[in-house]
Amino acid sequence: MTVWRSDIDALAFAPEGHAGICTVHRLAFRTLLGRMPTPEDCIAFFTANERAFRAAAGAKISRRGLARAANFHLTSRDVTAAIGVAQ
């Protein structure tokens, strides 16, 4: 499940094996893309780099010891680090 949440101006997805929701704000995508993206741009970038986003979410869950149902967000730094590892 990946959706654009216009109420919070963020992309939301369910990390594997986690009951909470992970969000990535449009401003994080702005840093990643180097321009202010549309929601469609954000979804396209997520789709093209889904493995890295999911890896970043898993790393944050582990690093922070998040509860199984905790909601959380990824920053552009979280995603950039995961993209570097995924390549």
Where are the regions a protein language model picked out?
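A broad, low-specificity signal marking well-ordered, structured residues that form hydrophobic/aromatic
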Residues: 11, 22, 72
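Short, charged/polar N-terminal "headpieces" of proteins
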Residues: 1-18
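Acidic, low-complexity intrinsically disordered segments
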Residues: 39-87
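Short N-terminal mixed-charge amphipathic segments
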Residues: 16-33
